[in-house]
Swiss-Prot record:
Catalytic activity: Catalyzes the rearrangement of -S-S- bonds in proteins
Record field: compositional bias (Basic and acidic residues): 443-452
InterPro entries recorded: PDI_TMX3 (IPR052250), Thioredoxin-like_sf (IPR036249), Thioredoxin_CS (IPR017937), Thioredoxin_domain (IPR013766)
Pfam families assigned to the protein according to its UniProt record, in alphabetical order: Thioredoxin, Thioredoxin_6
Annotated protein name in UniProt: Protein disulfide-isomerase TMX3
Entry-listed glycosylation sites: 258, 313
Motif (Di-lysine motif): 449-452
Lumenal compartment residues: 27-375
Stretch forming the signal peptide: 1-26
Alphabetized GO MF terms: protein disulfide isomerase activity
Keywords, in A-Z order: Disulfide bond, Endoplasmic reticulum, Glycoprotein, Isomerase, Membrane, Redox-active center, Signal, Transmembrane, Transmembrane helix
Active site: 53, 56
Topology with respect to the bilayer: Single-pass membrane protein
Length: 452
């Protein structure tokens, strides 16, 4: 027995050593034009990148780790990367519009990855998409095991039906976000009661909810809204995904490192309202908290002091702020009700003035971030163009002044010449008049003598 265990350990060590000796390029394949024809035979996880893209370079070591993780797990998924600037026709075929773009390709389906760019999240996404759309739960033990691993669980209960066809259709659309399962009624926990079968359930927040077509509307919309827990730790990626739900996002903005009563109180109040007022607010609001105000400030183009509470409308960029600090759940409920009845004043928006403000705010933020990260680079990037523009303006102004002075000098010369010519003419006329006067005088004197 000990010998068998030793052999097993040696086998693992040898296989790990062998894998470690394999270059990363063998685990992450560089793709070319042939990929277009050969891809349908396998499941692919592909990174579409551009050589000049900074985010692509940052993703590269993570992508290599993804290749190693998937290969060591024995997954059938093949990991590759393709230069979208060289093979632009392939990038266009898959609708690549930005870099990096991560896609899972399975048959004729292409799934976009929009989550955090970490090894764990990318691998989890790839394995979810590569597996079956609907995963069966044959026993209660399997159900309990899966429920512990997934905070949100969608389960179809029943035999073949129109509802199951819709469930499969929704799964093919939303498998990029969550898992979908099927089970018989006897596999479910004892506390679950169903009025009718077939049914679709979601297990989350230590309870379950049953889909009601009459109250909840379209199954796809219901799944899209229910795929989040009732209270979340919200970051930029989560907030982006919450935009698809159509809900307002109620966020307690705090500093998680600050254990003062002000920070812990606003978070606990938000949790309390989310849990105890689900029936009133769940359809319209998603509750959560955000660590730090940097992201929220850039989103709102404002400087929020923390701790605070803000409600975001991601569809039109509007937001709502309470008129005073919230001290208890009753005040938070009152504030949320004022949003529902339209008495709360909305700020922000996506109008023309706000778009212009966004342009200037983004420009300011870019300049500040560059100077903070590298003052010398900032001086070079912004000082050099300003210097060139200043020299050009000075040259233009100086040229105008010199031209004006030269023009005035020419005018003065012309005026002086004209004045001199006028004086000469007057002097000549004077001489002529004098000559004429002398002749007249002589003639007059002659006539007087003749008379005498």
């Amino acid at each position: 027995m000990a010998a068998a265990g030793l052999c097993f350990i040696l086998a693992i060590v040898s296989s790990t050593s062998l894998l470690a000796s394999v270059p990363v390029s063998a685990l992450v394949e560089d793709l070319d034009d042939s990929f277009k024809e050969n891809r349908k035979d396998d499941i692919w996880l592909v990174d579409f990148y551009a050589p000049w893209c900074g985010h692509c370079k940052k993703l590269e070591p993570v992508w290599n780790e993804v290749g190693i993780e998937i290969r060591t797990s024995g997954s059938p998924i093949r990991v590759g990367k393709i230069d979208a600037t060289v093979y632009s026709s392939i990038a266009s075929e898959f609708g690549v519009r930005g870099f990096p773009t991560i896609k899972a390709l399975k048959g004729d389906m292409a799934y976009n990855y929009r989550g955090p760019r970490t090894k764990e999240d990318i691998v989890e996404f790839a394995n979810r998409v590569a597996g079956p759309l609907i995963r069966p739960l044959p026993s209660q033990q399997m159900f309990d095991h899966v429920k512990k691993r997934h905070p949100v669980l969608f389960v179809y209960v029943g035999v073949e039906s129109t509802l199951k066809e819709k469930f499969i259709e929704v799964a093919s659309e939303l498998i990029v976000y969550t898992y979908f399962f099927s089970a018989s009624e006897d596999v479910l926990p004892k506390y679950v009661t169903l009025n009718e079968v077939p049914a679709v359930l979601v297990f989350k927040d230590s309870t379950y909810f049953v889909y009601d077509e009459y109250e909840d509307g379209d199954l796809s919309s219901w799944v899209n809204k229910e795929r989040f827990e009732g209270y979340l730790h919200i970051d930029g990626f989560t907030l982006y995904e919450l935009g698809d739900t159509g809900k307002l996002v109620a966020v307690a903005v705090i500093d998680e490192k600050n254990n003062s009563i002000e920070h812990t109180r606003i978070k606990s109040i938000a949790q309390d309202v989310a849990k105890n007022n689900r029936n009133n607010f769940h359809r319209d609001f998603q509750f959560g908290h955000m660590d730090g105000n940097d992201y929220i400030n850039s989103l709102l183009m404002d400087e929020l002091s923390i701790p605070t509470f803000v409600v975001l409308n991601t569809s039109n960029q509007q937001y709502f702020l309470p008129s005073k600090h919230i001290e208890n759940p009753e005040e938070m409920i009152q504030f949320i009700n004022s949003i529902l009845d339209g008495t709360a004043e909305a700020q922000g928006g996506d109008g023309i003035l706000q778009r212009i403000k966004r342009v200037f705010y983004d420009a300011k933020s870019t300049v500040v971030s560059v100077f903070k990260s590298s003052p010398l680079l900032g001086c070079f990037l912004f000082g050099l163009p300003l210097g060139v523009i200043s020299i050009m303006c000075y040259g233009i102004c100086t040229a105008d002044t010199e031209d004006g002075s030269e023009e005035m000098t020419r005018k003065d010369v012309i005026d002086q010449n004209a004045s001199d010519e006028g004086s000469d003419e007057e002097e000549e006329k004077g001489r002529e008049i004098t000559d004429v006067s002398d002749e007249d005088q002589q003639e007059k004197d002659f006539m007087e003598k003749k008379i005498d």
